[in-house]
Amino acid sequence: MKHFKQVIIMVFCVLFFSQFGNLHASEIKAVPTFHAIGLYWTPDGGSADKQVFVAFRIEGGEQWNEGLPMKYNPIGGTTEDISPYRGSIVNLTPNTTYEIKLTLEGTSISDTIVSKTWTEDFPIGETITLSDRNITYSVFDSGTKDGYLLIDGTNATIDVENNSDYCISVGGSYVIIRGFTLKNAKKCGILLTTCHDVIIENCDISGWGEKNEDGFGVNYQAGIYSESTSIKGIIVQRCKIHHPRYDANSWAELNDGGYHPSGPQGITLFNSGGNNVIRYNEIYSDSEHMFNDVIGAGTNGSFYGFPGPDSDIYSNYFANCWDDGIEAEGGNRNTRIWGNYLEEVFLPIANAATSIGPLYIWKNTSGRCYSPPGSYYGVHAPFIKMGFVGSIDWMTGHMYVFNNTILQPNNEGAGGIGVSDNANRYIKHCETRNNILDVGNASVNSISIRSENTDNNYDYDLYNGGYPADNGGHAILGTPIYIKDAYFDFDEMKADFSLNSLSLGYDAGE
């Protein structure tokens, strides 16, 4: 978005001593993806009154880029084998080596590390080319990190005609599934078992799923599915996942004794090992074949959940669900969500709760968001859910919400951050900057307001509903005015919702 200056996010927070002990003092661990590097550091002398300063540059470069100093936030009770301060450097270039320097405030304690982002050109070893078939194709063999096993389905269709549970089953690692059209699986389009480092790209998946006794789709059955907690390094890119065989119920429809939406999903990964990337996909359906969540699964009130640690979700189009467009709930340790467009969903981004963090949400845009009259939680849900599942004690991770936009087509967009039909959810450890929080109705808060909300930092947002009084003083009250030809083009997957130069908030960010 051009209306606010881009914020470079580098967050290093949360001190935790695991039952396995700490890493050696000042040892840095780096976990890269294509455009980000997650960092973990254990400096001697870390404490609540000391921030961590961050700098990075391309290896051999002269100019250091500085990050934001972050808070110290100890969390106990998890067996996750993690380091104290942690966070992410984002907006990086693939296949590029970076020098990273961390310094503990007020001390001479400093350390550096060199880390390289992922290449987008994965090496190919063996290639297996498939033609059309009507039975499941199972992948048992593995490639290596130096030579992936490519299963090439370009121009091939696997239509199992509801006679097999899956179109493709993957049990091998270092595997690329490319170019398939997958149809009519009894349960799920692609099943991932005990595998890692699997790339699913340029696939078209549709028509999967079974029907339950109430006539809705079976819960969690998905275009891409795994219930293995050991999978990690899963990349889903440039896929179209659409039109499951059956519908999910809305919050106004009884299903299996309750009103919570239940039914098919685009992607289901239960409590995975993380380091997953979901990018450049179109996951959508129609009003008669709605998803439960578009992507998600796992245990919300936990240190695990979806999408797993050190994972990225970006540049996707998500639509047509009765609950969450993106269900990023649980640990959210170095989870990064950016540049997605979501519409025809009840709730664009769910994060209840973020128990470890940090969670980054930036440059996402939501369109029409809706649930039928009589829905259990009202017609309009929050843009970002906030709150918790099970216990408020899970709300211990930090969250950073920057440069997002809530659109209000025909006044049918999402509610504010943590706000649905004027119900205000808990918010803790959240920082906002440069968001356009148009809630369409001034009687609804743009950000949840309740006395229990603590350790938050709000500023430089454009808002037209209620806004917490304890803010930084630079937020702007008003309704956005977009350029004359603001648009979203589904066929081209392009959009432009820049602010008009005469609009409040134009060029007024931090």
Kindly label every feature range from the protein language model.
Residues 35-39:
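Structural beta-strand segments of beta-rich domains
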Residues 44-56:
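Solvent-exposed loop/turn segments flanking beta-strands in beta-repeat/beta-sandwich domains
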Residues 53-95:
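Recognizes extended acidic, P/S/T-rich segments that occur
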Residues 91, 133-150, 158-198, 211-231, ...:
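Extracellular beta-strand-rich solenoid/capping regions of secreted or surface-exposed proteins
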Residues 127, 148, 152-156, 173-184, ...:
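Right-handed parallel beta-helix
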Residues 144-146, 254-267, 424-510:
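Acidic, glycine- and Ser/Thr-rich low-complexity intrinsically disordered tracts
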Residues 162-168, 184-191, 213-228, 249-270, ...:
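Extracellular beta-strand/beta-solenoid scaffold signature
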